[in-house]
Amino acid sequence: AGAASPSDRVVSAGSATTTALCLLLQILSERFGIECGSMTSIHAYTSDQALQDYAGSDFRRSRSAAKNIIPNSHEAGLWLGDILPAFDGKILTSALNVPVREGCLLDVNLVMEDAAVTAEDINEAMRAGAASHPGVVGVVEDPIVYSDVIGDARSLLFDTKGTIKAGNNIIKTLSWYENLGHAARLLDVVRLYAKLDKREAA
């Protein structure tokens, strides 16, 4: 978090999941009060997972990634407070690694401060957020599945069909994203620092 400077020597673009979660929370918190929530990233299996079962100290991560849904921890919650301080310690994060090659689905459940907020209010806020973050945030109105978003370089594709209100003030949301979006944000960071270097040289 904080302004970029030519004096920076180590920078990070976070992760695909952290970026998607932060975009969602930033957009919604600008319109509504959010008390707390939880996030589950339904995530393609990764290069550090085994393709076949083996004898390991972590019984879950030593199982075949290509054959299992594997509950896992996620560090997005640790970084969230650095990026959006208002949410420090307020969002529980976890992951399910599933046997697909790429891509993720973000399942976020939020406890809203105002019980009057509806599912359509959330969808409208995300449509407005997509309009103000072109090329980074998108909204999907059709009943899609993951293969429909492969090749999309946006970091968050909010699925309006997945927004549900439960009880008085709980909102469930679904959003799609894939690693291409994270690669695009890495390029954005490189371009930003390239511009800063040119300004300093001038």
Segments and roles (model prediction):
Residues 1-62, 165, 186-192, 196-200:
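N-terminal Rossmann-like NAD(P) cofactor-binding subdomain of oxidoreductases
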Residues 14-15, 69-71, 176:
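Hydrophobic alpha-helical scaffolding
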Residues 21, 77, 105, 183-186:
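A general structural signal for well-ordered alpha-helical segments in protein cores
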Residues 33-36, 41-170:
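C-terminal substrate-binding/catalytic lobe of Rossmann-fold NAD(P)-dependent oxidoreductases
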Residues 150-202:
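NAD(P)-dependent Rossmann-like dehydrogenase/reductase catalytic/cofactor-binding core
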